[in-house]
Swiss-Prot record:
Short name of any one Pfam family annotated for the protein: V-set
Lineage: Eukaryota, Metazoa, Chordata, Craniata, Vertebrata
Location of the region described as Framework-1 in the Swiss-Prot/TrEMBL record: 1-23
Residue span of region Framework-3: 57-88
SMART domains registered for this protein in UniProt: IGv
Keywords: Adaptive immunity, Immunity, Immunoglobulin
Framework-2, as annotated region: 35-49
GO CC annotations on file: immunoglobulin complex
Protein name: Ig kappa chain V region 3381
UniProt organism field: Oryctolagus cuniculus (Rabbit)
Chain residue ranges for the region called Complementarity-determining-3: 89-92
Miscellaneous remark of the record: This chain was obtained from antibody to type III pneumococci and was isolated from the serum of a single rabbit.
Record region (Complementarity-determining-2): 50-56
Length: 92
């Protein structure tokens, strides 16, 4: 069965720092991957689609990269407001 594996499970970082979240697909999905941000009590927010395309209104501090089976979300210049759950999702 198709699976997406995200690492690390959790991360701590300082304001102004950078974090990287990885997503590995069990089979190639080309660039059909999206990244979402989820905060408690709020709907999920689309950050990145097609692996690297920034969604409308999303800060350029968020960067998506990768293709095939390996993908990365990088958040730079961290702000307190970035505290959230982030997840990847296949859009194929």
């Amino acid at each position: 069965a198709f699976e997406l594996t995200q690492t690390p499970a959790s991360v701590e970082a300082a304001v102004g720092g950078t974090v990287t979240i990885n997503c590995q697909a069990s089979e190639s999905i080309s660039n059909w991957l999206a990244w979402y941000q989820q905060k408690p009590g709020q709907p999920x927010k689309l950050l990145i689609y097609k692996a690297s395309t920034l969604a409308s209104g999303v800060s350029s501090r968020f960067k998506g990269s990768g293709s095939g089976t390996q993908f990365t979300l990088t958040i730079s210049d961290l702000e307190c407001a970035d505290a959230a759950t982030y997840y990847c999702q296949s859009t194929d």
